[in-house]
Amino acid sequence: MPRDVDLFVLNQVIEHVPHPDRLLTMLANALSPGGHIVIETPNTGGLDARLFARRYWGGYHIPRHMVLFNERNLRTLVERSGMRVVETAHLASPAFWIQSLHHAASESRMAPLASLCTFRNVPLVALFAAFDIVRGRLTTTSNQRLVARLAT
């Protein structure tokens, strides 16, 4: 296989793949020297992931999300595929907050409030976007970006 690809972008993709290790190894083998892979994926280490982990976290997207990552296991997976992590970032994820609240409210005495927890509720989306932007500067969020470079 020629090593002639400079960049692969996996934007909310890797969690849908049954064998992400095989995918990353295949992509690493196609990268040109100095080539990069950018991965954005849910992060199970975010606050909402931990608060709603037992059942309601919006990032689960069962059955579509086959594999979920925290920062550590994503980094390990990338490094085992022959790449070096050069950058990580925490991204805002208001959608996961809204989905989590909607799921939790739907199955509780607060069910009437579930109808407020939608993406059409612009103030709620703005609130959680701002919350995650601040959190992302201080700690983790439930959405992450990792940039890796082919190790030479």
Give each language-model segment a name:
Residues 38-40, 58, 116-121:
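N-terminal start-of-chain detector that recognizes signal peptides
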Residues 54-58, 138-139:
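Short, flexible turn/loop "capping" segments at secondary-structure junctions
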